[in-house]
Amino acid sequence: MLAFPGRMKKNRHILILSAAMTARPLHLTTYNIHKGFSQFNRRLMVHDLRQQLRALNPDLLFLQEVQGLHQHHANRHGDWPELPQHEFLAEDHWHASYGANMAYEHGHHGNAILSRHPILASHNQDVTHLQFERRGLLHTQVQPAGWAQPLHCVCAHLSLFGTSRRRQMQALIDKLEEVAPPGTPLIIAGDFNDWRNAADRVLVRQLGLTEAFEVFGQQPRRSFPARLPLFRLDRIYVRDLKIEHAEVHWGGSWARISDHAALSAWITPANGAP
């Protein structure tokens, strides 16, 4: 299991991190991008995806089903990006870290974290239970400008099968108890495939996490399919952070880009000061 930290090109839009910038909430988004294709793989949408993410302009992106390499698609599609998708999407807007989970003869795919702020460290944890369904947890440390502590960020894409998900969540808990003890600001976001809401019962109890929408007296929001969400598959969990606002991006142009809706949350330090 490999994690590939990337570098962000400097430009005039990101060189200056002012006090006013650090005072505003950090905007984070989680999104299963379906390897850059629309639902049912009908159209290559990675260029539209990049425009949509630039317009949304989050500080942190937790992406699942990111295509690191696919020689067949590159040969078939004339507009297939030359760069791996995490680098193509990040370009000069975000730092990028990628963890390859599933490798095959013609390529690989996995999870990625894109950050406007520096990525200090990155590790991809293999949590595969079933060999035909390889999974990983991408863990990075991100240092927002002006914050006293780095954020521990985990991008998750869990199994379709309940037994495997339970094993993967326990592996996540064991790892975070070791590297991110209580008092450490923590974000876990991604595609949990958790339509039964079992993750809440486990992660909230054992890691002290808060689900982004439950802060406002709601259940985790429906996020699949993107055209008319029916299932609660995707999540944003935080610890030692305050959720200021949360929303779902679905329908319209979002429904044309991927089969999942995107989730966003705006966070500040729990004590109100960086």
Segment roles from a protein language model:
Residues 1-10:
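Extreme N-terminal basic, low-complexity initiation segments
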Residues 9-60, 92-98, 103-274:
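Active-site regions of metal-assisted phosphoester/phosphodiester hydrolases
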Residues 38-43, 70-82:
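Short, flexible/disordered intra-domain loops and linkers
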Residues 65-66, 190:
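Short acidic donor-binding/metal-coordinating loop in glycosyltransferase active sites
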Residues 67-69, 195:
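Short "lid" loop at the C-terminus of a central beta-strand within the Rossmann-like core
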Residues 81-96:
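Charged, glycine-enriched surface loops/patches
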